[in-house]
UniProtKB/Swiss-Prot annotation:
Keywords: Cytoplasm, Methyltransferase, S-adenosyl-L-methionine, Transferase. It is an enzyme of class 2 (transferase). Catalyzes the methyl esterification of L-isoaspartyl residues in peptides and proteins that result from spontaneous decomposition of normal L-aspartyl and L-asparaginyl residues. It plays a role in the repair and/or degradation of damaged proteins. It comes from Shewanella pealeana (strain ATCC 700345 / ANG-SQ1). This is Protein-L-isoaspartate O-methyltransferase. One of its GO terms (biological process) is protein repair. It comes from the Bacteria. It is found in: Cytoplasm. The keyword Protein transport does not apply. It holds the Pfam family PCMT. Belongs to the methyltransferase superfamily. L-isoaspartyl/D-aspartyl protein methyltransferase family. GO terms for cellular component: cytoplasm.
Length: 211
Protein backbone atom coordinates (compact mmCIF):
# COMPACT_ATOMS: atom_id res chain seq x y z
CA UNK A 1 0.00 0.00 0.00
CA UNK A 2 1.07 3.57 -0.53
CA UNK A 3 1.77 5.56 2.66
CA UNK A 4 -1.55 7.44 2.60
CA UNK A 5 -3.59 4.25 2.15
CA UNK A 6 -1.51 2.47 4.78
CA UNK A 7 -2.18 5.22 7.32
CA UNK A 8 -5.89 5.25 6.42
CA UNK A 9 -6.15 1.46 6.81
CA UNK A 10 -4.42 1.64 10.19
CA UNK A 11 -6.81 4.37 11.31
CA UNK A 12 -9.73 2.21 10.17
CA UNK A 13 -8.43 -0.70 12.24
CA UNK A 14 -8.16 1.60 15.26
CA UNK A 15 -11.75 2.75 14.79
CA UNK A 16 -12.87 -0.89 14.64
CA UNK A 17 -11.08 -1.54 17.93
CA UNK A 18 -12.99 1.38 19.43
CA UNK A 19 -16.20 -0.13 18.02
CA UNK A 20 -15.57 -3.37 19.91
CA UNK A 21 -13.42 -5.56 17.65
CA UNK A 22 -10.83 -7.16 19.94
CA UNK A 23 -9.14 -9.88 17.86
CA UNK A 24 -5.69 -8.46 17.10
CA UNK A 25 -5.14 -10.73 14.09
CA UNK A 26 -8.36 -9.45 12.51
CA UNK A 27 -7.37 -5.84 13.14
CA UNK A 28 -3.95 -6.47 11.57
CA UNK A 29 -5.56 -8.06 8.52
CA UNK A 30 -7.83 -5.01 8.08
CA UNK A 31 -4.83 -2.70 8.47
CA UNK A 32 -2.94 -4.69 5.82
CA UNK A 33 -5.74 -4.79 3.24
CA UNK A 34 -5.93 -1.96 0.66
CA UNK A 35 -9.72 -1.52 0.55
CA UNK A 36 -9.49 1.06 -2.25
CA UNK A 37 -8.35 -1.71 -4.59
CA UNK A 38 -11.76 -3.37 -4.17
CA UNK A 39 -13.70 -0.30 -5.31
CA UNK A 40 -14.16 1.72 -8.47
CA UNK A 41 -11.67 4.65 -8.57
CA UNK A 42 -14.51 7.17 -8.15
CA UNK A 43 -15.21 5.74 -4.68
CA UNK A 44 -11.58 5.39 -3.63
CA UNK A 45 -11.77 8.43 -1.36
CA UNK A 46 -14.40 6.60 0.72
CA UNK A 47 -12.43 3.35 0.98
CA UNK A 48 -11.49 3.70 4.64
CA UNK A 49 -14.82 4.95 5.90
CA UNK A 50 -16.68 2.46 8.07
CA UNK A 51 -19.53 2.11 5.59
CA UNK A 52 -20.85 -0.25 2.92
CA UNK A 53 -20.33 0.95 -0.67
CA UNK A 54 -21.74 -0.09 -4.07
CA UNK A 55 -19.64 -2.33 -6.33
CA UNK A 56 -22.10 -2.72 -9.22
CA UNK A 57 -24.63 -5.41 -10.14
CA UNK A 58 -26.75 -4.30 -7.19
CA UNK A 59 -24.09 -5.54 -4.76
CA UNK A 60 -22.03 -3.83 -2.06
CA UNK A 61 -18.70 -4.12 -0.33
CA UNK A 62 -19.63 -4.70 3.31
CA UNK A 63 -19.07 -2.22 6.10
CA UNK A 64 -15.58 -2.87 7.55
CA UNK A 65 -17.04 -3.33 11.05
CA UNK A 66 -19.25 -6.22 9.92
CA UNK A 67 -16.37 -7.75 7.92
CA UNK A 68 -14.24 -7.69 11.06
CA UNK A 69 -17.06 -8.86 13.35
CA UNK A 70 -17.96 -11.86 11.19
CA UNK A 71 -14.29 -12.75 10.80
CA UNK A 72 -13.77 -12.52 14.56
CA UNK A 73 -16.66 -14.94 15.12
CA UNK A 74 -15.36 -17.37 12.48
CA UNK A 75 -11.91 -17.44 14.08
CA UNK A 76 -13.21 -18.43 17.51
CA UNK A 77 -13.04 -22.13 16.63
CA UNK A 78 -9.64 -21.84 14.84
CA UNK A 79 -10.85 -23.11 11.44
CA UNK A 80 -8.53 -24.72 8.90
CA UNK A 81 -10.98 -24.66 5.99
CA UNK A 82 -13.55 -21.90 5.51
CA UNK A 83 -16.29 -21.46 2.91
CA UNK A 84 -17.41 -17.95 2.00
CA UNK A 85 -20.73 -17.49 0.22
CA UNK A 86 -20.79 -14.27 -1.81
CA UNK A 87 -17.29 -13.31 -2.94
CA UNK A 88 -18.50 -9.90 -4.12
CA UNK A 89 -15.59 -7.48 -4.44
CA UNK A 90 -13.23 -9.95 -2.77
CA UNK A 91 -12.50 -7.70 0.23
CA UNK A 92 -13.87 -10.09 2.85
CA UNK A 93 -11.98 -12.94 1.16
CA UNK A 94 -8.77 -10.90 1.27
CA UNK A 95 -9.14 -10.40 5.02
CA UNK A 96 -10.02 -14.06 5.63
CA UNK A 97 -7.20 -15.38 3.44
CA UNK A 98 -4.65 -13.73 5.73
CA UNK A 99 -6.09 -15.58 8.73
CA UNK A 100 -7.05 -19.12 7.68
CA UNK A 101 -5.03 -21.85 5.90
CA UNK A 102 -7.64 -22.60 3.22
CA UNK A 103 -10.50 -20.47 1.91
CA UNK A 104 -13.14 -21.49 -0.64
CA UNK A 105 -15.41 -18.75 -1.98
CA UNK A 106 -18.51 -18.87 -4.19
CA UNK A 107 -19.96 -16.03 -6.29
CA UNK A 108 -23.01 -16.14 -8.57
CA UNK A 109 -22.11 -13.04 -10.64
CA UNK A 110 -19.37 -13.93 -13.10
CA UNK A 111 -17.98 -10.42 -13.60
CA UNK A 112 -17.54 -9.91 -9.84
CA UNK A 113 -15.90 -13.31 -9.47
CA UNK A 114 -13.35 -12.53 -12.19
CA UNK A 115 -12.48 -9.15 -10.65
CA UNK A 116 -12.14 -10.63 -7.16
CA UNK A 117 -9.82 -13.37 -8.40
CA UNK A 118 -7.59 -10.76 -10.07
CA UNK A 119 -7.48 -8.60 -6.95
CA UNK A 120 -6.45 -11.42 -4.63
CA UNK A 121 -3.80 -12.58 -7.09
CA UNK A 122 -2.41 -9.04 -7.15
CA UNK A 123 -2.21 -9.13 -3.35
CA UNK A 124 -0.32 -12.44 -3.53
CA UNK A 125 -3.06 -14.36 -1.69
CA UNK A 126 -2.92 -17.85 -3.15
CA UNK A 127 -4.74 -19.98 -0.54
CA UNK A 128 -8.14 -19.18 -2.04
CA UNK A 129 -10.23 -21.41 -4.33
CA UNK A 130 -12.90 -19.64 -6.40
CA UNK A 131 -16.17 -21.02 -7.71
CA UNK A 132 -18.73 -19.41 -9.99
CA UNK A 133 -22.06 -20.80 -8.86
CA UNK A 134 -25.19 -20.64 -6.73
CA UNK A 135 -24.28 -19.73 -3.17
CA UNK A 136 -27.40 -21.43 -1.80
CA UNK A 137 -25.81 -24.73 -2.80
CA UNK A 138 -22.38 -24.06 -1.28
CA UNK A 139 -19.46 -26.11 -2.59
CA UNK A 140 -20.07 -29.71 -1.44
CA UNK A 141 -17.07 -31.28 -3.18
CA UNK A 142 -14.65 -29.12 -1.17
CA UNK A 143 -16.37 -29.75 2.19
CA UNK A 144 -16.87 -30.34 4.97
CA UNK A 145 -15.91 -26.95 6.36
CA UNK A 146 -14.84 -25.84 9.82
CA UNK A 147 -16.66 -22.56 9.23
CA UNK A 148 -19.02 -21.08 6.65
CA UNK A 149 -19.56 -17.34 6.28
CA UNK A 150 -22.48 -15.98 4.25
CA UNK A 151 -22.16 -12.37 3.14
CA UNK A 152 -25.73 -11.86 1.92
CA UNK A 153 -29.04 -12.19 3.75
CA UNK A 154 -30.97 -15.43 3.37
CA UNK A 155 -34.72 -15.65 4.01
CA UNK A 156 -33.95 -18.85 5.95
CA UNK A 157 -30.86 -20.90 6.74
CA UNK A 158 -29.98 -22.93 3.59
CA UNK A 159 -30.05 -26.64 4.40
CA UNK A 160 -27.32 -27.34 1.83
CA UNK A 161 -24.90 -25.13 3.77
CA UNK A 162 -25.74 -26.69 7.12
CA UNK A 163 -25.03 -30.12 5.60
CA UNK A 164 -21.53 -28.99 4.60
CA UNK A 165 -20.48 -28.05 8.15
CA UNK A 166 -17.96 -30.30 9.86
CA UNK A 167 -18.70 -31.51 13.39
CA UNK A 168 -17.93 -28.55 15.64
CA UNK A 169 -18.22 -26.23 12.65
CA UNK A 170 -19.78 -22.78 12.72
CA UNK A 171 -22.10 -21.08 10.21
CA UNK A 172 -22.32 -17.29 10.41
CA UNK A 173 -25.20 -15.94 8.35
CA UNK A 174 -27.54 -12.93 8.19
CA UNK A 175 -31.14 -14.15 8.13
CA UNK A 176 -34.29 -12.20 7.36
CA UNK A 177 -35.77 -9.97 4.70
CA UNK A 178 -36.55 -6.38 5.72
CA UNK A 179 -35.28 -6.97 9.26
CA UNK A 180 -32.19 -9.17 9.52
CA UNK A 181 -30.26 -10.82 12.33
CA UNK A 182 -26.72 -12.14 12.20
CA UNK A 183 -26.86 -15.74 13.43
CA UNK A 184 -24.14 -18.10 14.58
CA UNK A 185 -25.04 -21.77 14.19
CA UNK A 186 -22.75 -24.40 15.71
CA UNK A 187 -22.87 -28.07 14.76
CA UNK A 188 -22.38 -30.70 17.47
CA UNK A 189 -22.90 -34.12 15.92
CA UNK A 190 -26.31 -33.92 14.29
CA UNK A 191 -27.50 -31.18 16.63
CA UNK A 192 -27.27 -27.43 16.09
CA UNK A 193 -27.23 -24.52 18.48
CA UNK A 194 -28.16 -21.02 17.34
CA UNK A 195 -27.08 -17.67 18.75
CA UNK A 196 -28.21 -14.20 17.67
CA UNK A 197 -25.19 -11.90 17.36
CA UNK A 198 -26.74 -8.56 16.35
CA UNK A 199 -29.11 -6.83 13.95
CA UNK A 200 -27.63 -6.24 10.49
CA UNK A 201 -28.51 -5.13 6.96
CA UNK A 202 -27.24 -7.05 3.92
CA UNK A 203 -28.18 -7.40 0.25
CA UNK A 204 -30.28 -10.55 -0.34
CA UNK A 205 -28.77 -13.98 -1.02
CA UNK A 206 -30.13 -14.77 -4.48
CA UNK A 207 -30.24 -18.25 -5.95
CA UNK A 208 -29.00 -19.14 -9.43
CA UNK A 209 -26.09 -17.83 -11.50
CA UNK A 210 -25.66 -14.57 -13.41
CA UNK A 211 -23.17 -14.20 -16.25
Amino acid sequence: MNPVASTSALNLARSLYEAGIRNEAVLRAVANTPREQFLEPALGHKAYENTALPIGQGQTISQPYIVARMTEIILQNKPSKVLEIGTGSGYQAAVLAQLVPQLCTVERIKSLQIQARQRLKKLDLHNVAFKYGDGWQGWPSKGPYDAIMVTAAASSVPEALVAQLADGGVLVIPVGELSQQLLKLTRVGNQFTSEVIENVRFVPLVSGELA
